[in-house]
From Swiss-Prot:
Origin species: Azotobacter vinelandii (strain DJ / ATCC BAA-1303)
GO molecular function: ATP binding; tRNA dimethylallyltransferase activity
Keyword annotations from UniProtKB, A to Z: ATP-binding, Magnesium, Nucleotide-binding, Transferase, tRNA processing
Protein name from the UniProt record: tRNA dimethylallyltransferase
Residues that hold ATP according to the record: G12, P13, T14, A15, S16, G17, K18, T19
Transmembrane portions of the chain: none
Gene: miaA
Homology family: Belongs to the IPP transferase family.
Subunit and partners: Monomer.
């Protein structure tokens, strides 16, 4: 058995049932929850992020939820620092960190560390975002392919946040993200390892999703419409009326929030907002699946399984996570 303390990653696409399973595990295991979700960090963004209810958060506290105002940014590097601190504190008390969420870049940052990259340039970022809105993101993707084909191959044309960051790195430094990573590997060969040497834990990797993609699509559509019934538009309108927020902020680029914001701006009808919100959520799920397909040592669970808790506990025992 490894001498490293244990940790559990519970991953999966949006609307797959990650949170429900995590809460079941928290009821029976000596574990504490850490959110791995780039939207749940924001206060006042509850309905559209499917944030656990306040009563559940009181019973089962989640680290890294409600830690930023929507006007602020939150990077993968900040997440890594915060998550490592939370994991160390949980482990020091003899308990198991259970990380749950679908922001796959955050998991990757934890496992592999992050290459040193230039700081953000707000003016340049605003320029690139304006170009993407005017010319279409496919145009920026083609531009990225000319200066950093490796990153372009990894980044989907419908992923504006990563597109903008990759182009920003090149414009600021004159080096592509790929070149930065290669330079870091040359300086420290261990930085290219992907088996978790940067994370001093014995990690069990779990993923949950329906076995049929159509079932996930139906769950996504049903959940988005339920969010609207629960007051999602009113939630976004409170943010929209603040006056200090805008559509280009990372918080307002979150799936669903962008579409409702455009509806409030009069750019979409309600019907268009609903349709585009559902499509954007499906595209997010597709990107999450792409990450997960390339993940190693991943134990899959079926969202519709009626014995996921027992199956997970049995797997954790087999993996020697449970004493």
């Amino acid at each position: 058995m490894s001498h490293l303390p244990p940790a559990i990653f519970l991953m999966g696409p949006t609307a797959s049932g990650k949170t429900d399973l995590a809460l079941e595990l928290a009821r029976v295991l000596p574990c504490e929850l850490i959110s791995v979700d780039s939207a749940l960090v924001y206060r006042g963004m509850d309905i559209g992020t499917a944030k656990p209810a306040k009563a559940l958060l009181a019973e089962f506290p989640h680290r890294l939820i409600d830690i930023r105002d929507p006007a602020e940014s939150y990077s993968a590097a900040e997440f890594r620092d915060d998550a490592l601190a939370a994991m160390a504190e949980i482990s020091a008390r003899g308990r198991i960190p259970l990380l749950v969420g679908g922001t796959m870049l955050y998991y990757k940052a934890l496992l592999e560390g992050l290459a040193d990259m230039p700081s953000a340039d707000p003016a340049l970022r605003a320029e690139l975002e304006a170009r993407g809105a005017a010319e279409g993101w496919a145009a920026l993707h083609r531009e990225l392919a000319t200066v950093d084909p490796e990153s372009a191959a990894r980044i989907h044309p419908n992923d504006p946040q990563r597109l903008v960051r990759a182009l920003e790195v090149y414009r600021v430094s004159g080096l592509s993200m790929t070149a930065h990573r290669l330079r870091q590997v040359a300086q420290n060969p261990l930085s290219d390892r992907s088996a978790g040497e940067h994370l001093p834990y014995t990690v069990v990797h779990l993923a949950i999703a329906p076995t049929q993609r159509q079932i996930l699509h139906e769950r996504i559509a049903r959940r988005f419409r339920l969010m609207l019934e629960q007051g999602f538009v009113d939630e976004v309108e409170l943010l929209w009326r603040r006056g200090d927020l805008h559509a280009s902020l990372p918080s307002m680029r979150a799936v669903g929030y962008r579409q409702v914001w455009e509806y409030l701006d009069g750019l979409l009808t309600r019907e268009q907002m609903v349709e585009r919100g559902i499509i954007a959520t499906r595209q997010l799920a597709k990107r999450q699946f792409t990450w997960l397909r390339n993940w190693t040592d991943l134990h899959w669970l079926d969202s519709l399984g009626d014995d996921n808790l027992q199956r997970t506990l049995k797997y954790l025992e087999t993996a020697a996570i449970l004493a």
